[in-house]
């Protein structure tokens, strides 16, 4: 935290933000993994929830839409499609880009550069 307080240039801010956004993306992978684990092992039943979506909503205020998105992000970008670790090729994209890229075919996702903006990814989605 102290290192953030010493940033004194725009470039320093950009570097720090990229690092933090990467951590958020990795968090999405982990949240998706834990939700899938809860769903697959039916852990939600331990507290009487009907499904993983009710558990996520009641416990963490995660909507069904976001729970599905977290699990899709894990399916798509985690190692072997079911792990708490992001695939190396998707490191550095950030959570917003990964979320936008979900709708792209795999062959298109594979060629989206890390420095593409969310706006550029949306433009590609419109063309496809």
Regions found by a protein language model. Give the residues of each.
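N-terminal acidic-hydrophobic amphipathic loop/helix motif that frequently occurs adjacent to catalytic
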Residues: 1-60, 75, 79, 104-115
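Amphipathic alpha-helical oligomerization/scaffolding segments
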Residues: 77-128
């Amino acid at each position: 935290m102290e290192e953030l307080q010493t940033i004194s240039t725009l470039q320093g801010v950009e570097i720090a933000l990229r690092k933090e956004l990467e951590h958020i993306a990795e968090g999405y992978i982990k949240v998706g993994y834990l939700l899938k684990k809860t769903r697959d092992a039916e852990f939600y039943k331990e507290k009487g929830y009907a499904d993983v979506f009710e558990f996520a909503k009641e416990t963490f205020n995660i909507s069904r839409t976001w729970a599905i998105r977290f699990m899709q992000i894990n399916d798509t970008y985690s190692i072997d499609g079911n792990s708490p670790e992001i695939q190396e090729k998707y490191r550095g994209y950030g959570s917003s880009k990964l979320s936008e890229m979900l709708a792209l075919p795999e062959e298109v996702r594979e060629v989206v550069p890390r420095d593409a903006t969310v706006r550029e990814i949306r433009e590609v989605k419109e063309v496809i």
